[in-house]
Each structure stands twice: as structure tokens, then as C-alpha cells.
UniProtKB/Swiss-Prot annotation:
One of the primary rRNA binding proteins, it binds directly to 16S rRNA where it nucleates assembly of the body of the 30S subunit. GO terms for biological process: ribosomal small subunit biogenesis; translation. This is Small ribosomal subunit protein uS4c. InterPro entries: Ribosomal_uS4, Ribosomal_uS4_bac-type, Ribosomal_uS4_CS, Ribosomal_uS4_N, S4_RNA-bd, S4_RNA-bd_sf. GO terms for cellular component: chloroplast; small ribosomal subunit. Part of the 30S ribosomal subunit. Contacts protein S5. The interaction surface between S4 and S5 is involved in control of translational fidelity. Residues 20-44 are annotated as: Disordered. Disulfide bonds: none annotated. The gene is rps4. It comes from Lotus japonicus. Residues 89-150 form the S4 RNA-binding domain. Keywords: Chloroplast, Plastid, Ribonucleoprotein, Ribosomal protein, RNA-binding, rRNA-binding. It comes from the Eukaryota. SUPFAM superfamilies: Alpha-L RNA-binding motif. Belongs to the universal ribosomal protein uS4 family.
């Protein structure tokens, strides 16, 4: 299944806020309708929608998400927590959380078009897994800096997660540590996602 490229508001109306996909928020009316419908949903539907929230927020294909679930399942610790850490430490998501891109699709475009350095080297793979002490900077040219500056200026004034440090005037971000689960940028029950895939096999 390919990455979703359709109407974004349609997805947030059904699944709730997906800040990685779009800065738009569902209306109060649609949230109330979703709450009233939730009492009628089957357990399968609930697990499916949690999985879809994760996939659309992080901009993944079905195959990519399944791959992350399998990697998380082989790691030590809670599969759900490890899954969220893997997704949050992707380069495209780090750029988004720093405010250097307005959405994850925009961050992916910055990376694909080679506007971003990691530790002084161009990285053009959005799924690159960032690690503690990685330094992320804009390419040293006017176009790259302008694109990132526009995002920084339009980013909502939210508290930066503790695993990241931003130096906006230098177009630079630092990864301090692996993300703590309480700072994950999406309201999600990750255990339902793991359950969804465990029942597919």
C-alpha cells in the first residue's frame, strides 16, 4: 500500500488530530460525532484506526510500518514503546518536532531535495534513524535556509521535547537523547497497533 496523498482533512475528521500530516485540527462537531460512533465500533475497528493514526501521522506505507513493528518486536522492552521511539527518531520526524518543517511530508521533501545535513554530511533518506549527539543543520545556501526559516517562523510556540535542542538562528538542531515516551507527538494507544499486527499473522 502506497503512502497516503489524498485529502488530509478527511483523515483528521475520522481519526482525530494528526499533527505530522497537517496542522489543521478536526472541528468540534466531527470530534463529537467520532465519540458517539466509538461506542458502536468493533474491537477490530478500534485497533485498525489506531494503526491508521500512526501510519498517517508519520507518513508511512503499510509495508514500512509493518517493518518497524517487526523490528520493535525483536528489541528488548515494550514493543509498543520501542515502536514509537523508532518512529520518533526518524530524521523527517525530528525535523518536524524541531519546527524546521511544518509537517512530516514537508520534512521528507527537505531531506529528499538534499537541504539537510546530519553531522556535516548531506542525508537524503527521510527514514534515517537519528541517534544521541546527532547535529542537524540546514545546507549552507540561501534556498535551504529560507525554507527552514519559513517553517520556524510559522511553527506554533510549543514546548520542545526534552530530547531535542534547537538553535534557530544557526538553523541547527541537536538530538540530546532517545525520546521519552511521554514526549511522543501523537495521542495514540500503541499497544492496540501491536495487537492489530499480532492478529494479522
Amino acid at each position: 500500500m502506497s503512502r497516503y496523498r489524498g485529502p488530509r482533512f478527511k483523515k483528521i475528521r475520522r481519526l482525530g488530530a494528526l499533527p505530522g500530516l497537517t496542522s489543521k485540527r478536526p472541528t468540534v462537531g466531527s470530534e463529537l460525532r467520532n465519540q458517539s460512533r466509538s461506542t458502536k465500533k468493533s474491537q477490530y475497528r478500534i485497533r485498525l484506526e489506531e494503526k491508521q493514526k500512526l501510519r498517517f501521522h508519520y507518513g508511512l506505507t503499510e509495508r514500512q510500518l509493518l517493518k518497524y513493528v517487526r523490528i520493535a518486536g525483536k528489541a528488548k522492552g515494550s514493543t509498543g514503546q520501542v515502536l514509537l521511539q523508532l518512529l520518533e527518531m526518524r530524521l523527517d520526524n525530528i525535523l518536524f518536532r524541531l519546527g524546521m518543517a511544518s509537517t512530516i511530508p514537508q520534512a521528507r521533501q527537505l531531506v529528499n531535495h538534499r537541504h539537510v545535513f546530519v553531522n556535516g554530511h548531506i542525508v537524503d533518506i527521510p527514514s534515517y534513524r537519528c541517534k544521541p549527539q546527532d547535529i542537524i543543520t540546514a545546507k549552507d545556501n540561501k534556498k535551504s535556509k529560507t525554507l527552514i526559516q519559513n517553517s520556524l517562523e510559522s511553527a506554533p510556540r510549543e514546548e520542545l521535547p526534552t530530547h531535542l535542542t534547537l538553535q534557530p538562528f544557526q538553523y541547527k538542531g541537536l538530538v540530546n537523547q532517545i525520546i521519552d515516551s511521554k514526549w511522543v507527538g501523537l495521542k495514540i494507544n500503541e499497544l492496540l497497533v501491536v495487537e492489530y499486527y499480532s492478529r494479522q499473522t
